[in-house]
Amino acid sequence: MEFNDKIKQFSERVVKIKDTALTEESTKMSLIVPLFQILGYDVFNPLEFCPEYTADVGIKKGEKVDYAILQGGNPTILIECKSCTEPLDKHSSQLFRYFSTTTAKFGILTNGIVYKFYTDLEEANKMDLTPFLEIDMRNIKAVSYTHLT
């Protein structure tokens, strides 16, 4: 199956099951992890797709971002997940804290339906307050597919 077809099929799945994945954990397992698998990540290899990645903030130890995509043992993308019933507006500060303590260059905040992509375009090593890309999986268009690859 072609990538575009997989994404379209997954988008339809999101619409169908979003009302049953009510907890953060069920959102991760039914909506978020499957998308990263479609994108080509080995979600079962913690050397590539690491769950509960430690991103200690200052004196606060044990802080963990939901997932980190690793290259050579270093995080390149941090993924902070919320329940699909949770609006994302109030949660970027959590990702902001994690971003500043790691070598990651991209951060994704998602509830499995909406994906907000952040980086540090405005100031090096400091996550921008505004996402450079936002994708709603319920309304994904062919033009959005190119942003995912």
Regions flagged by a language model, labelled:
Residues 90-93, 99-128:
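Nucleic-acid nuclease catalytic cores
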